[in-house]
Amino acid sequence: RDYRRSGMSLSEEDREKLKTIQKKLGTLTIEFDTNIREDKTIVPIPLGDLEGVPQDVIDGIDVVDENYQVTLDYPTFGPILDYCSVAETRKNVRFAYSKRAGLENVEILERIIKLRDEASDLLGYATTADYETETKMSKNAATVAEFYEKLRPVVRKKAEKDWAELLAAKREDLGDPTADFYPYDFSYYYEKIKNDKYAVDSQKVQEYLPLQNVMDGLFEITQNL
């Protein structure tokens, strides 16, 4: 199997093609990740529209022309989605986050998909999914699809229950029995339910788990593995 996957069974010409494809894939994957990591999108948010966001987060955001200059790094983006009570702010920030490096990366993603298909075809696999799953427990794409079909009704039942709870929380919060639920509402009402129902405040928990302490703890654990 490894012999086949590495392309050793191919002709010399096809092995060279495979090497070229793999090199391009490596370069494109790095470029894709770099574009997201280095995205400099700024979302202008009017003063007063970060209500509910922890003050230490707000204090770290620049202000220009009566607007907060919200960046999309997680330490800023995360708390806004979790705690900002202004729906329009959550909507704008989440939408911008989902589009990070979109113009550059859509083209790169299309090229990656095409190259992966070419590599799978060259190696004799029916699909890229079959190539990717061959070394996994599932062994092939058909097994994965079958598993998902069996899992779907089980997961759906729990998801519908969670969805109903989140929707009810939003409608109660707004006093609007007809309010709809949107993707940018999820984190906010999930945190609200945790706080209201289970008295779990993620911000309070973080006070006892500062990043450096967590990193030091993880380092100590890995040293003993």
State the predicted function of each range.
Residues 1, 71, 107-111:
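Short acidic alpha-helix initiation/capping motifs at coil-to-helix transition points
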Residues 1-36:
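Extended, charged alpha-helical coiled-coil/arm scaffolds that mediate oligomerization and mechanical coupling
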Residues 3-4, 78-80, 98-102, 133-144, ...:
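Second-shell loop/turn segments in exported
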Residues 3-4, 93-96, 198-200:
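Short, charged/polar, low-complexity loop and linker segments
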Residues 7-18, 99-114, 118-131:
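A conserved hydrophobic secondary-structure block that centers on an alpha-helix together
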Residues 24-27, 34, 38-72, 115, ...:
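Active-site-proximal, well-structured secondary-structure segments within enzyme catalytic domains
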Residues 63-100, 186, 191:
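Active-site-adjacent "gating/activation" loops or surface patches in catalytic cores
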